[in-house]
UniProtKB/Swiss-Prot annotation:
Protein name (Swiss-Prot/TrEMBL): Uncharacterized protein YDL157C, mitochondrial
InterPro entries on file: Mitochondrial_unc_protein
Organism: Saccharomyces cerevisiae (strain ATCC 204508 / S288c) (Baker's yeast)
Subcellular localization: Mitochondrion
Any one GO CC term of the record: peroxisome
Record's miscellaneous remark: Present with 752 molecules/cell in log phase SD medium.
Family listed: To S.pombe tam6.
Keywords: Mitochondrion
Keyword Mitochondrion: yes
């Protein structure tokens, strides 16, 4: 069944196994990198810098300031700070403050092509 049909005719509900709901290290690394990176971009204020691109499109500095009011800038910069904080919390979760956390095991390919549990 396709994913689109599953929206209108969902499969029966079932209990998820523990392995299906466990966190994984690659997921944690990617969410940390995205949160810190995008949060840094927003917190830096770069999205609100008037530059050559806006001038080339014929947008004046006063028009640019109207399109980006102060409350909008503060909101996005604050959200960027929250993303940075979330990224550091997420990145240190398994080894700093939640030391008993279990992660999914992945099967690795050995040199002879067989899979082995990690």
């Amino acid at each position: 069944m396709s994913n689109i049909l599953a929206v209108f005719n969902p499969p029966p509900q079932r209990e998820l196994e523990k392995e299906e709901t466990m966190d994984c290290v690659p997921c944690q690394v990617m969410s940390t990198m995205f949160s810190v990176g995008f949060g840094s971009y927003l917190a830096s204020g770069k999205p609100f810098k008037y530059g050559k691109k806006e001038a080339k499109r014929g947008i004046s500095l006063t028009e640019f300031e109207k399109r980006n009011p102060q409350w909008w800038k503060v909101t996005l910069r604050s959200f960027g700070g929250l993303l940075i904080a979330f990224g550091f919390v997420r990145g240190t979760e398994g080894w700093l403050w939640h030391k008993n956390k279990e992660y999914k095991n992945y099967k690795k390919l050995s040199n002879d092509g067989e899979t082995q549990a990690n």
